[in-house]
């Protein structure tokens, strides 16, 4: 056999079927591997070579096959061509042996397990275990719920069976693939199986014609709603018949309490499946019809009037909900209602797992009779409207003077018994939607005070006064802050069998449970103008934030460019340019004009301190009035002025005087020029310009000293106010005056 040991991953990933090999390339192989599919001639040749040389030297065998490595030849023989390889069905003895070996070595060391099974390779053992022998694999018949999950997942994921298998614990990707290809595809495509959504699942309930609040409806109404994490509540129709119990749905799983890292991903995928499955019910849902419900206990009731009230309160603060109904609620009318019955034990006991919740129950537990006797409440009047359900939201406010207060926002408004015209005791538990709290900052109690003042009946005066006192005490507090936990957590915990403990209340906010408050008027839309509201100062302005800033804004491309520049080279700094750099710029310009470098650059030349504007202005003035021409080159080491003034144009004379004096100091004081030509020639002979490199012949070049020592001297030279410059300027004027007298066109010299 081969001398080189193979890793288990390589053994598992290499297939024994006749196809291209995706074997990782290894270092040290002298031949380039050919990844092309094995041909029949190569297989025949490999069989003959194995018969001749055996299976001990694969390098020798690979040398007879072009572009095939010894590793490829070995695997081709062991996985495909070996006549001892068993490709048929598994026997009971083999299955029992695999089970024993897995218990001994674990479900990952398949290469080692395959060595104990003659004729089987690691890949075969692995697939046999995961698809058939694993006790966690379900072998029962496929249920309709599993079919629906496969159908919905296949519409979105296609043939990604491994991803679909994550949605069905206990089912393998291979079994799901076989079930789809053999049974489900034909039934779905030809017989219309599962095409009508969830209708077949609910056929036994015979309530398809009844209106119901579906989970999809809750999803569209509330952004905090997570359908796959609501363990224990049910939807009921007005006549009390249960349409769907979420706790028994196959799509719902208990909240992930274990440490499975993929649990959250699975829940999101299940949520997508559930949303699509509920689409059919939402589209085929009939218009809501009035009904009646006479008796219930231990439940929270959803009232249509609450939905109407939320519409009226939230129309100025949010656009998240679509509000199609806008009605006026009468104080004397009562209408049949739709409600959401939430199992108290399932929800409230599960809330105990939230750290903030035990304190909120203290207030409820202080008056168990007032809070547990839900049957003492009647539903307020309202026309049928879509039920808007938002998650539970608890907020805590300071406790004052022993008044037990709490706010239990389940988006459910439980209104007290309506007072008759002659008056009477009643209880009110006004609850506020968290959406109102989310989009407006004033305290909840101030809103309740204004809402109750709209009432019209006589019995509302006492309730209005009581809540006004509470509002006056609460108005000085800051608006309700964001809670440190998601409101949806109250429905996201698994239900238990604990009973509601209401003996030690906690102090939260809003409804006064310890006092008897009379509310006999329904909640109506406020008629007070927006600018006259008491809490208008607390409301968040609707001004766009983009116009609040006064600083100029840099376009995004420039921001990105500056950020990249600072990231690469550090923060940008503004560095002032020294005068030495300006001198180099002037030298470069003059060098381009004259063709030669007429300045002497020394290592210790000082940095000039003249103003940048004066320097540039003087250079422009000289360049504008004079034309520069190239110097005659006599020797490579020096540049001398010509002695023959008749052959040189007047521009050369002026250029010499103006270019040499600003940067070079006069060698001696004998250079006072006279109007005669011999003085000019003597001055020209006195000066020589050294190039940047030292002149090898000191006799032919005169080394000039440093430049001016002070700013005043520098300015005098720059502006041409030295004695020599004035003399040269006067000579230039005389020369040009004679030139203009003989010429036909007049030329003016601007200095």
Curated annotation (Swiss-Prot):
Residues 58-81, 110-133, 161-184 bind DNA. There is a cross-link at residues 199, 591, 601 (Glycyl lysine isopeptide (Lys-Gly) (interchain with G-Cter in SUMO2)). Residues 230-294 are annotated as: Transcriptional activation domain. Keywords: Acetylation, Activator, Differentiation, DNA-binding, Isopeptide bond, Nucleus, Repeat, Spermatogenesis, Transcription, Transcription regulation, Ubl conjugation. GO terms for cellular component: nucleus. GO terms for molecular function: DNA binding; DNA-binding transcription activator activity, RNA polymerase II-specific; DNA-binding transcription factor activity, RNA polymerase II-specific; promoter-specific chromatin binding. Component of the DREAM complex (also named LINC complex) at least composed of E2F4, E2F5, LIN9, LIN37, LIN52, LIN54, MYBL1, MYBL2, RBL1, RBL2, RBBP4, TFDP1 and TFDP2. The complex exists in quiescent cells where it represses cell cycle-dependent genes. It dissociates in S phase when LIN9, LIN37, LIN52 and LIN54 form a subcomplex that binds to MYBL2. This is Myb-related protein A. It comes from Mus musculus (Mouse).
